[in-house]
Amino acid sequence: MACAAARSPADQDRFICIYPAYLNNKKTIAEGRRIPISKAVENPTATEIQDVCAAVGLNVFLEKNKMYSREWNRDLQYRGRVRVQLKQEDGSLCLVQFPSRKSVMLYAAEMIPKLKTRTQKTGGGDQSLQQGEGSKKGKGKKKK
């Protein structure tokens, strides 16, 4: 334990890890979600988390080949984790607005829906849903 205290908070090994499952509203707490479902985001990616954290001024880097241990789906979409620096060399906070890992997760979940990639996807998806609803009129019960 003594050698763990000797390492600097600025080492990349000491950065906090954020997996997309922590912010996913499709996951239960048992499956790895760490924030309230009301604040969680639908299927966030590690790249989106990195973009949001980098935009606010945090020191981040993306590890694309890492996977969350509770994630059963092995698709490329679900891979990746983001490492975020919370503390500087002297132990003080990098940004005062992020005193804990939970504050970073809540901020990322709040900002991801505002990304341009998210707003463009939802705008096009609504039209396809409206067109598909008209074809369901012909279905009825089976006759015996």
UniProtKB/Swiss-Prot annotation:
Annotated coiled-coil segments of the chain: none
Subunit and partners: Component of a signal recognition particle complex that consists of a 7SL RNA molecule of 300 nucleotides and six protein subunits: SRP72, SRP68, SRP54, SRP19, SRP14 and SRP9. Interacts with IPO5, IPO7, IPO8, KPNB1 and TNPO1. Interactions with IPO8 and TNPO1 may be involved in SRP19 import into the nucleus.
Family label: Belongs to the SRP19 family.
One Pfam family here: SRP19
One GO location term (cellular component): nucleolus
Primary subcellular site in the record, as a coarse category: cytoplasm
Reported function: Component of the signal recognition particle (SRP) complex, a ribonucleoprotein complex that mediates the cotranslational targeting of secretory and membrane proteins to the endoplasmic reticulum (ER). Binds directly to 7SL RNA. Mediates binding of SRP54 to the SRP complex.
Gene for this chain: SRP19
Residue segments, region Disordered: 117-144
Name the UniProt record assigns to this protein: Signal recognition particle 19 kDa protein
Gene Ontology molecular function terms on file: 7S RNA binding; ribosome binding
This protein's UniProt keywords: Cytoplasm, Nucleus, Ribonucleoprotein, RNA-binding, Signal recognition particle
Location in the cell: Cytoplasm; Nucleus, Nucleolus; Nucleus, Nucleoplasm
Gene Ontology process terms (BP): SRP-dependent cotranslational protein targeting to membrane, signal sequence recognition
